[in-house]
Amino acid sequence: MALDTEKIIEDLKGASILELNDLVKAIEDEFGVSAAAPVAAAGAAGAGAEKTEFDVELTDVGQEKVKVIKVVRDITGLGLKDSKDLVDGAPKNVKEGVSEDEANDIKAKLEEVGATVTVK
């Protein structure tokens, strides 16, 4: 038995909303599937979870660029050139995937030398 896809689509176009709803339910029951979008289900599951990893973004260097570079170098362990490039490229993430306490500690150190920082 060959399926004529175009004929099936034309038949579906002529069906009422109630008939289409019944068809979807029958297909779900027959094949053991769900018509729910998997993206929506994943989004709903993730919305209830508490965030445990944070990113620290240097949004503005402020007036004390040299001090900010030194702090970034201490925090990241990068070399002088890489730390300077990171600071010059602001807004940029200084650290990613850190705990809330560590993120707030980094933020405090950078703000102490005049930088503007966002924890995401």
UniProtKB/Swiss-Prot annotation:
Protein name in UniProt: Large ribosomal subunit protein bL12
GO biological process: translation
Function description: Forms part of the ribosomal stalk which helps the ribosome interact with GTP-bound translation factors. Is thus essential for accurate translation.
Family: Belongs to the bacterial ribosomal protein bL12 family.
GO molecular function: mRNA binding; structural constituent of ribosome
Subunit organization: Homodimer. Part of the ribosomal stalk of the 50S ribosomal subunit. Forms a multimeric L10(L12)X complex, where L10 forms an elongated spine to which 2 to 4 L12 dimers bind in a sequential fashion. Binds GTP-bound translation factors.
Taxonomic path: Bacteria, Bacillati, Bacillota, Bacilli, Lactobacillales
UniProt keyword list: Ribonucleoprotein, Ribosomal protein
Lineage top rank: taxon: Bacteria
Disulphide connectivity of cysteines: none
GO CC annotations, alphabetized: cytosolic large ribosomal subunit
Pfam families in the record: Ribosomal_L12, Ribosomal_L12_N
